[in-house]
Amino acid sequence: MSNKFKKILVTCALPYANGPIHIGHMLEHIQADIWVRYQRMRNNEVWFISSDDAHGTAIMLKSEKLGITPIKLIKKIKEEHIIDFSNFNISHDNYHSTHCVENLFLLRKIFLSLSEQKLINEKKIFQFYDNTKKMFLPDRFIKGTCPFCSSKNQNGDNCEICGSIYEPTDLVNPISVISNSVPILKNTTHLYFNLPLFTNMLNKWIHSGILEKSVAKKTEEWLKSGLKEWGISRDAPYFGFKIPKFDKKYFYVWLDAPVGYISAFKNFCTKNKKVDFNEFWKKESKCELYHFIGKDIIYFHTLFWPAILEASSYRKPNGIFVHGHLTINGLKLSKSRGFLIKASDWIKCFDSDSLRYYYASKLSNNINDIEINLEDFIQKINSDIVNKLVNLASRNASFIHKYFDGYLADSLGDCNLYQDFIDISKKIANFFENRQFSSVIRECMKLLDLANQYINQREPWKIKQDNFNKLHTICTVGINLFRLVVIFLKPIIPDLAKKTEYFLISDLTWKGIDKPLLSHKIKKFKKLYNRINHDKILQLSLLCK
């Protein structure tokens, strides 16, 4: 990694404001948060922004069902989302909502710019209409069979199985999600963004190194098959922002929501005058911008969104980091399908570091799905964190306080392990930089094996009183090796890192790894982490019913 100071803006896909955060959402926010925390440890200026996606038919219908206004619903949901993210130590610098004055202003500004450039076309089309509910059906309120791979129960705009994008009218055997009736086709008028005009620009952009190879390959397939104009409007009734000069037309959520990245940062800059909005979002910006997203929304972020940014004279992202779906026993977690584990239920059974660590042990920079197995989860946490990491501190700290009044020795003796760990830090830093968190975990476990082997071979518990200097040195080495590993894992397990800082009476910083703690007093060891019991699985399963 370059020593040059960087300015970085990081976003996650916006959670929808019609229900709770589940551990699938948390996968993405934990992945981004680990990367953000690492960048902060390297003294880069990093701003981590997210927001609730607060518009759409689903919110309108849910508020009607609850007998409250959409405004009250999204306010309540946002408060719940913020609590959930806080419980998992997601360090957002600002968490906003797309239902805000900043988003309204930016949407209208962008729409006016697109219109003036004649990039918006008005078309008469046939659209599915629910004759029972007397309303046009948005894409996500139509289910049917994918016209490309024949997967059943797919959305009206894209297939979660093969990733194909299509028109709702292409679906086989469509059904209205709202009334479960067969929709009819009805004439209406909509606005479309001229996406095909940006084909050459997008082709150059996706091959500029900003996408992982598998993501670039998938995007290239869509480009080769030909881009279509992109609908940016929806019919009333709808909860969202009205399109100026178009009666009963509203901005579609896939224009509204990504603009939320910009509006959330705009709101942040309003509250933090030292941060310059234009420095990060102007077209020629030297700052870095990264989007963390799931693989089901690649198309929107690698084609539609960069074209909108290009047309509106905003900068494009330096990278789009894509992760796979989260599965349990092979089934994808999905709020719309009712198969999920709420973050609020998880935190009642397990601490936040445990999920962060388990996710990190499976995360890399590819888009493979991530499988959750609760038995494996418990085994991994108890083995890695309790048996290897925390036990290393416990067994050495007891001698330090029993015989040396809590003070570490003044040297590490002739032990070369400390320098070996420092040498490995460059490799670990590279893994962090490239989001290969599972490799970070593997390297740290190798280091812990070496550290524990060092202690076991020297058997400090057998050393007699006439050789206390040797005992002092061995235990000081053990504590310092423990400290280094916790520094490496600090972005992943912040709660344990904080407890370790209290125990060691020392901040855990990346720049501090070159200087071991010598002639330094530490506190008496208190349990840093509790072993997880298997009865927690039953507790979680009961909460999820």
Swiss-Prot record:
EC number(s) stated in the UniProt entry for this protein: 6.1.1.10
Transmembrane parts of this sequence: none
CC per GO annotation: cytosol
Keywords: Aminoacyl-tRNA synthetase, ATP-binding, Cytoplasm, Ligase, Metal-binding, Nucleotide-binding, Protein biosynthesis, Zinc
One function term, GO molecular function aspect: methionine-tRNA ligase activity
Cofactor: Zn(2+)
Cited function: Is required not only for elongation of protein synthesis but also for the initiation of all mRNA translation through initiator tRNA(fMet) aminoacylation.
Name under which the protein is recorded: Methionine--tRNA ligase
